[in-house]
Amino acid sequence: MNKFLKEFKDRGFFYQCTGEENLSQLLDKEKIRAYIGFDCTAESLHVGSLLQIMCLRLLQKHGHQPIVLLGGGTTRIGDPSGKDKTRTILSEDEIEKNINNIEKILKNFLDDKDPETKPIFVNNYTWLKNLNYISFLRDVGKHFTINKMLSFDSVKIRLEREQSLSYMEFNYMILQAYDFLELNKKEKCMLQIGGSDQWGNIVNGVDLIKRYSNNHVYGLTTPLITLASGAKMGKTESGAVWLDKKFLSSYDYWQFWRNIDDRDVLKFLKIFTDINVDEIENIKDDNINELKILLANKATSMLHGEDEARKCQETAKQTFSENSLGDNLPTTQINKKMLDDNISILDLVILSKLESSKSEIRRLIKGNGIKINGQAISDEKFLITEDLFKSSLIKLSLGKKKHIKVELI
């Protein structure tokens, strides 16, 4: 088996492949270009997209050149895959802003020093905006049958549930297939990689290229990654685990990995770090907390840099072991004048965005789960006063794992 495909499987990236044996032979013979598409409906990606990013890195490691497709055109429509309702359509300016920011995030992960493997960034709006509808139906639409389109899960599930599916969304799969055709023509792209929910769209592209130009290309999908708890990768009780520091601090990102369930640690070391698979096997019986710190450091270094990862580890040590205020601990600010309004502990927790549910805060208070400077607060009417702030700072804690600094300004 080809080395890229072997490592792809060994790391747990593999789900399905079209023409696997032929793809393996192709990868043995030559270096290829492969693409992964990214939705641009939000300003940032979250860790739910991280497996696809790791696929891009693995392509580079094995000497192949990744193409990053940013869906400036298809975002104007919305991918119905895995959705039970029509997405909100964004404005042109919002989409452009999202594209620029997502490209910056992806560049943190990818090496651009080697011209042979340097990522190629493309925006499918470049070719989709000028499509002539009549020509498109004649040249591309004729290769699709309604019978087959209705068989794909993204369509079938919505219809079975009697949920509306717009004609606009129904056409999404044709446009994604057309993206592959364009990249095959313009960039000699031979492979599309995507999540398992994209299988139907990817197969459409492979078939379209075969019918349109008689070229043989391939599709490769990754599994849906879930946490041991059964939750989707990318979401926590506190919200999405964003890859942009504007939305999630490097410390909170580090903590996400540090607090992974014990059952997920070895799997995630293989998927979300570059550590050699054999090395991971050799350390699998090491102390689980040391392995979690290793995972947190490697994952954070990849996105935010090694220095930032070290600072996060030191902050965690100061916060948990030394019960002090770590330098990298997330900080929220409140104005001194606000104290005149008799802010309670309940108000402070909400202002700090550690928790938004008053009933949940009350439950935590009853269980001694909320602390200021290490001291449990047992009264929900406890007032926040200036004398609590040492050097204008307090440490506010929810449970054992959520900590922030509150600065008085």
Curated annotation (Swiss-Prot):
GO MF annotation terms: ATP binding; RNA binding; tyrosine-tRNA ligase activity
Sorted UniProt keywords: Aminoacyl-tRNA synthetase, ATP-binding, Cytoplasm, Ligase, Nucleotide-binding, Protein biosynthesis, RNA-binding
Compartment(s) where it occurs, according to its Swiss-Prot or TrEMBL record: Cytoplasm
UniProt KW tRNA-binding keyword: no
Catalyses which reaction(s): tRNA(Tyr) + L-tyrosine + ATP = L-tyrosyl-tRNA(Tyr) + AMP + diphosphate + H(+)
Binding site for L-tyrosine: Y35, Y172, Q176
GO BP term, example: tyrosyl-tRNA aminoacylation
Top-level taxon in the UniProt lineage: Bacteria
InterPro entries: aa-tRNA-synth_Ic (IPR002305), Rossmann-like_a/b/a_fold (IPR014729), S4_RNA-bd_sf (IPR036986), SYY-like_C (IPR054608), Tyr-tRNA-ligase (IPR002307), Tyr-tRNA-ligase_bac-type (IPR024088), Tyr-tRNA-ligase_bac_1 (IPR024107)
CDD domains from the UniProt entry: S4, TyrRS_core
Residue window of motif 'HIGH' region: 40-49
Residues annotated as binding ATP: K235
Entry's family note: Belongs to the class-I aminoacyl-tRNA synthetase family. TyrS type 1 subfamily.
Known role: Catalyzes the attachment of tyrosine to tRNA(Tyr) in a two-step reaction: tyrosine is first activated by ATP to form Tyr-AMP and then transferred to the acceptor end of tRNA(Tyr).
Name of the featured protein: Tyrosine--tRNA ligase
Native source species: Pelagibacter ubique (strain HTCC1062)
High-level lineage: Bacteria, Pseudomonadati, Pseudomonadota, Alphaproteobacteria, Candidatus Pelagibacterales
